[in-house]
Amino acid sequence: MVKVGAVVVLYNPNFDVTKKTLSSLASQVDQICVVDNSPSDHSEVLSGYESVEYKPLLKNIGIAAAQNIGIRYFIDLGYDFVLFADQDSIASEKVVDKLLENHQALKEASIKVGAVGTRAINRQTGLPYVEKSNEIRIIDKRVLSNTSNITECYSIMSSISLIPWKYS
């Protein structure tokens, strides 16, 4: 069975939103590692959540360094995938299953994949975010002819993205 761990990085979080983030992930992954870049401890946010590892840093070391702490945690435990989520990202139902299915479809088609992710939707407008300069560049072609939901792109947002450990 595939093991998926989620890394959620905090920085002075809004507790209500962060609880929604954790709740949206809890049933979809095997464990959540919360790495806290805030100058104070926020362990109270995690009360009531099983399978959550809390790593308070008590200083801001940056999102990438904090994500690396979470990655190392799951590598050491032998996990197959890591899912990144921001403290305010609400994962839709079954999103992890869909990302795993897309990864598997690409692997079966012998397409090497570094990460699979979602399209970011603006909560206020309900519309996908559009490209700003060259931040997110999507190639307008479908990767597999038998699916219309996988699109090749040069980069993705880290939040709600799935990273495999073995390059495939």
Where are these regions (language model features)?
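Conserved nucleotide-sugar donor-binding
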Residues: 157-168
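A conserved acidic beta->alpha catalytic loop
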Residues: 36-44, 59, 89-90
